[in-house]
């Protein structure tokens, strides 16, 4: 049995994934962020965290395991640290929020740590 490979360019694949997320009520920017991360994982050879997970995310969003429009909130915060409740967001979205907060803290205070 021979395997067939199909070349799929990154941008059309990203756009497809984004449309899937948007169809289940994920805001456009969050859909784009998540789609870009999935495709980049595949491009880096980390297939376990790539587009193959799209069905799992779709099912999780439909079943309420993940929330398409999460209400993320800061639980605790100091000048250099924060604890962020991701609100059952897609991990890529919550991770980006936490990373952005950590960078802002580091720019202001020299170091920043955020736990999501």
Spans of features found by a protein language model:
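Generic N-terminal amphipathic, Lys/Arg-enriched alpha-helix
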Residues: 1-24
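Short polybasic/polar patches that bind polyanions
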Residues: 22, 39, 107
């Amino acid at each position: 049995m021979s395997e067939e490979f199909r070349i799929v360019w990154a941008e059309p694949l990203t756009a497809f994934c984004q449309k899937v997320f948007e169809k289940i009520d994920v805001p456009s920017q969050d859909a784009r962020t998540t789609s870009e991360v999935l495709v980049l994982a595949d491009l880096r050879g980390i297939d376990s965290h790539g587009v193959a997970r799209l069905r799992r995310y779709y099912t999780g969003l439909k079943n309420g395991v993940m929330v398409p429009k999460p209400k993320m909130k800061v639980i605790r915060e100091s000048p250099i640290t924060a604890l962020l409740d991701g609100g059952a967001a897609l991990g890529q979205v919550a991770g980006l929020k936490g990373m952005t907060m950590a960078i802002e803290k580091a720019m202001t205070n020299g170091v920043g740590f955020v736990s999501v």
